[in-house]
């Protein structure tokens, strides 16, 4: 997959 920005935890 392409890199996706994860939501800040």
From Swiss-Prot:
It is a multi-pass membrane protein. Disulfide bonds: none annotated. It is found in: Plastid, Chloroplast thylakoid membrane. It comes from the Eukaryota. Keywords: Acetylation, Chlorophyll, Chloroplast, Chromophore, Magnesium, Membrane, Metal-binding, Phosphoprotein, Photosynthesis, Photosystem I, Photosystem II, Plastid, Thylakoid. Signal peptide: none annotated. Coiled coil: none annotated. The modification Phosphothreonine is found at residue 3. The keyword Acetylation applies. Photoregulated by reversible phosphorylation of its threonine residues. One of its GO terms (biological process) is photosynthesis. The keyword Metal-binding applies. One of its GO terms (cellular component) is photosystem I. The modification N2-acetylarginine is found at residue 1. Its main location: plastid. Belongs to the light-harvesting chlorophyll a/b-binding (LHC) protein family. The N-terminus of the protein extends into the stroma where it is involved with adhesion of granal membranes and post-translational modifications; both are believed to mediate the distribution of excitation energy between photosystems I and II. The LHC complex consists of chlorophyll a-b binding proteins. The light-harvesting complex (LHC) functions as a light receptor, it captures and delivers excitation energy to photosystems with which it is closely associated. This is Chlorophyll a-b binding protein. It comes from Spinacia oleracea (Spinach). The lineage of its organism: Eukaryota, Viridiplantae, Streptophyta, Embryophyta, Tracheophyta.
